[in-house]
Amino acid sequence: MKITWLGHSGFRIAIEQAVLLVDPWLTGNPLFPADRREEALAGATHILITHGHGDHTGDTVAIAKERGLPVVGIYDLVTWLQEKEGIDGIGFNKGGTVTLGGARVTMVQATHSSSMSGEAGPIYTGTESGYMIAGEGHVIYLSGDTDIMADMGWMGEYHRPDVGILSAGGHFTMDMKRAAFAARKYFDFRTVIPCHYRTFPLLEQSAEALKEGLPGVEVIEPQVLVPIEI
């Protein structure tokens, strides 16, 4: 299994026979090198989105049309994109599981908001979500944009993820200290990868507080387009 950061909250996850592009905001992402776009997209099988905000949906429609990839996510957002943009999609909802190239992807709760920009203001696109991605003997908890929430308790107990990809930049999501608290209290991760940080001055620039709060856990600060093998 390989997890590759695309900057901000974007990832490329190669698991089982699937290559998932998660929240692929490439164009305009200050951390993503535009001349390496093909490297990020090569072999992708699905686009997995957590919510509608532009720093997450980003290049979703362009990539879906260019590569013929289905967009996977919350029913409301995916259905709206299918109707508006004519792309393929797999819409489902909290508690549902879809199998993507042998990987089992279950949608779970997050606490944030979800909208896309429209001419008359925000267009609300269903609710925000996280995912449990199971395959190759591992379970990844992809938090999506979220704060700490009590639901993490049963989610950790039921799904037992060993890898956490946690939004931890603060201001719009939990910060590094809160992410460390959530990981300690609700999960038993072997590996934690922070995201939604370093992109703008408003967000946290270092994961040191996360590392300090999780002794005994491998906290990996991702580097853009450098694969992490699990």
UniProtKB/Swiss-Prot annotation:
User: Which key words tag this protein in UniProt?
Assistant: Hydrolase
SMART domains named among the record's database cross-references:
Lactamase_B (SM00849)
**What is the protein named?**
UPF0173 metal-dependent hydrolase RSKD131_0588
Family indicated by similarity: Belongs to the UPF0173 family.
Question: Which Pfam families does the entry mention?
Answer: Lactamase_B_2 (PF12706)
Q: Example GO molecular function term?
A: hydrolase activity
The species is: Cereibacter sphaeroides (strain KD131 / KCTC 12085) (Rhodobacter sphaeroides)
